[in-house]
């Protein structure tokens, strides 16, 4: 048994000890190094993990079952929405790709030797468009491939309960009808930014500003869409209001929006949102804020942002 300062955890133990947990124990520095260097022995010990980085074992089992009669070696991508699979095919045009439809999933298979896998894997990771482990569990259970499964409490309209809870965290000016739910934070930003870029372009607005340090998925989503339909300008120091103001003076009505975190993760830096709000109002630009680990309840920024994505 390996130990850590937080107690006694084995390598790969889900935290909490539930099949769909997204945190997993790496109790020693050697385990962390093994994970980062993709050591096969370390990775084999991880049944679950943060979905963008670790393929849940149930998703792996589902993929293996779907491809059980297949003779060729491929990389499989299980999309939650057919539209995202179609977007990948349109964007990267992978050679010899195969698509298979299922119940609430779409499988894209690309030959392992294809160089397209690098870009497709990156898109799949940064957009958060894969299926959930619970969908995989449903598939395996219906196929008779699981001896037991997670037991869930029956509720009425679960989505309404979730929206009501989140809206209260935002404060009295936000109601459940103001919320759109996504499968993950990365997927929420991907959906938002893809639509925002198209809308801004129709209005002749092509300049997007990254204000301060942003999460990797946010950066990559901006690069994915804005780089082909506009321009992304970075303001690395979130306290550099002079630079931010000068960009608005230079680009004016061409600015589509400002994307920022409040506070930034992991440095916990906070920009002057009131100043940014004023600049965006002058240019009729969007202000998009991610309250990161602080959450909307504690950040108190909902009234200053056009969109809060979390």
Per-region residue spans from a language model:
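Conserved N-terminal alpha-helix of the aminotransferase class I/II PLP-enzyme fold
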Residues: 1-191, 195-197, 211-234, 241-243
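Conserved PLP-enzyme active-site core in the AAT-like
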Residues: 178-310
């Amino acid at each position: 048994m390996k130990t850590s300062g937080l107690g006694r955890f084995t390598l790969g133990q889900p935290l909490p000890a539930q099949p769909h947990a997204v945190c997993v124990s790496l109790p020693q520095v050697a385990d962390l190094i093994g994970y980062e260097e993709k050591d096969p022995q370390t990775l084999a010990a991880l049944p679950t993990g943060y979905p963008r980085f670790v393929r849940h074992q149930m998703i792996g089992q589902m993929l293996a079952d779907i491809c059980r009669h297949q003779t060729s070696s491929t990389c499989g991508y299980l999309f939650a929405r057919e539209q995202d699979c179609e977007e990948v095919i349109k964007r990267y045009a992978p050679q010899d790709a195969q698509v298979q439809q299922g119940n609430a999933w779409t499988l894209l298979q690309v030959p392992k030797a294809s160089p397209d896998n690098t870009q497709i894997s990156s898109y799949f990771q940064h957009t958060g468009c894969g299926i959930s482990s619970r969908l995989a569990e449903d598939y395996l259970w219906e196929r008779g491939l699981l001896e037991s499964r997670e037991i869930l409490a029956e509720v009425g309209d679960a989505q309404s309960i979730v929206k009501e809870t989140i809206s209260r965290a935002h404060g009295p000016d936000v109601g459940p009808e103001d919320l759109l739910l996504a499968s993950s934070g990365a997927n929420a930003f991907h959906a938002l930014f893809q639509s925002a870029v198209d809308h801004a372009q129709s209005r002749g607005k092509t300049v997007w500003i990254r204000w301060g340090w942003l999460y990797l998925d946010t950066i990559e989503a901006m690069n994915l869409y804005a780089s082909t339909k506009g321009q992304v300008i970075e303001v690395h120091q979130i306290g550099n209001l002079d630079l931010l103001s000068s960009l608005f003076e230079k680009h004016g009505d061409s600015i589509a929006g400002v994307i920022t975190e409040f506070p930034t993760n992991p440095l916990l830096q906070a920009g002057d949102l009131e100043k940014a709000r004023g600049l965006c109002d002058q240019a009729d630009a969007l202000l998009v804020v991610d309250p990161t680990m602080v959450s909307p309840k504690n950040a108190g920024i909902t009234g200053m942002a056009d969109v809060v994505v979390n």
